[in-house]
Every structure is written in C-alpha cells, then in structure tokens.
Curated annotation (Swiss-Prot):
TM ranges: none
Gene designation: folE
EC number: 3.5.4.16
Pfam families attached to this UniProt entry: GTP_cyclohydroI
Family from the record: Belongs to the GTP cyclohydrolase I family.
Name of this chain's protein: GTP cyclohydrolase 1
Catalytic activity: GTP + H2O = 7,8-dihydroneopterin 3'-triphosphate + formate + H(+)
This protein's UniProt keywords: GTP-binding, Hydrolase, Metal-binding, Nucleotide-binding, One-carbon metabolism, Zinc
Signal sequence annotation: none
Length: 194
C-alpha cells in the first residue's frame, strides 16, 4: 500500500498547542498515558488535513478520449473529514455522476482521489460537495456533473442534539444536470439505486 504523503505542519507548534489544551481541560499531560499524546495527535492532524494545500482537480491526471457520451457514475466512495466548526469528524459516502463532453473521460480512481483530497481538510459538507463537482468541471469540462454526498456528523451524534444515525445529504449540480430537472432526476435515481 502506497504511504500517504502527509501535510507539512508546524509539528512543534501543534504539539505545544495540544499539550496546553490538555492542561486547559484539567489533565496532566505529563502522566504516563498522555506523555506521547501531543505527538500522536499532531501526527493524526497531519494525516486528517493532508489535502489542505492540494487542489482536487490536480488528481485528474489521466484523461482519455473514448467517445463515450453516456453518463458515468461512481457510487459509494467512502470518505472521512473534519467539521471545521467543532473539529470532530464527519464521514460518509460520495456519489459522482458526469456526462462526458467530446468523449473526455478520466480513470475511475481519479474520482475517488478527488474526494479524498477535498475531504482531508477542515471542511463543511456543503463546500465538500461543491469542491468535488467544480474540480471535475475544471478538469474534464463535462456536459453535466452531479455530486451527492451523504454523511453522519459527530457534532450531531456526540454533542448537542445527540442524534446518532442521522444523515445529512447535500447535492451539487453543474451544466446539464443543473439546467434540466428531468435529466438530474434520472441520474439521481441511478445514483441512489441500491
């Protein structure tokens, strides 16, 4: 398995902040169980935010002309992200549909990579959905794009209203799928079909 390149963070600053946070909540950062916690948490954040300085459209390195003019759908792309409001995870699945223009298609894994890059940063689900769609539009110039993201937010599960299992669904449509409701509904039905 290829090792993921981690975002370059100011490790010392991150570790010091985590150390201070542990003190702020009344913990002893020098006790045995917490000695390496600042280092571990800083490393985790470097992984969680590895997409922060990347552009999802740059993941579309493989573009082919296949004279395919019908919809391409990739469903159930799992992702994890971090809510920028509460700094707790949200996770779920992205479903992506695009209608090629002039036969321009991309490798299917590139769609999953774009989701990965866009999700690995402090994020809002609404923005995540739009960033995925916009990356595809910029890279392939398709006739239409539809992205549906469904996710469970730990800020609704662990705190506040405490409603585990609740899902948030967001969509972003571009091109034909924004302009033509019947086309959008047809593709949406395919995306959500079990």
């Amino acid at each position: 398995m290829k090792r993921e390149r981690l975002m370059s963070i100011n490790k010392e600053k991150a570790e010091a902040a985590i150390y201070q946070f542990l003190e702020a909540i009344g913990e002893n950062p020098n006790r045995e169980g917490l000695l390496d916690t600042p280092k571990r948490v800083a490393k985790m954040y470097a992984e969680m935010f590895a997409g922060l300085k990347k552009d999802p459209k740059e993941e579309f390195t493989a573009v082919f002309t296949e004279h395919h003019e019908d919809v391409v759908i990739v469903k159930d792309i799992s992702f994890y992200s971090m809510c920028e409001h509460h700094q707790v995870p949200f996770y779920g699945k992205a479903h992506i549909a695009y209608l090629p223009s002039d036969g321009r298609v991309t490798g299917l894994s590139k769609l999953a990579r774009a989701v990965e890059v866009a999700s690995k940063r402090p994020q809002l689900q609404e923005r995540l959905t739009a960033q995925i769609a916009d990356a595809l539009v910029e890279a392939l110039h398709p006739t239409g794009v539809l992205v549906l993201v469904e996710a469970e937010h730990m800020c609704m599960t662990m705190r506040g209203i405490k409603k585990p299992g609740s899902k948030t669904i967001t969509t972003t449509a571009r091109g034909l799928y924004k302009e033509d409701r019947s086309e959008r509904q047809e593709v949406m039905a395919l995306m959500t079909k079990v």
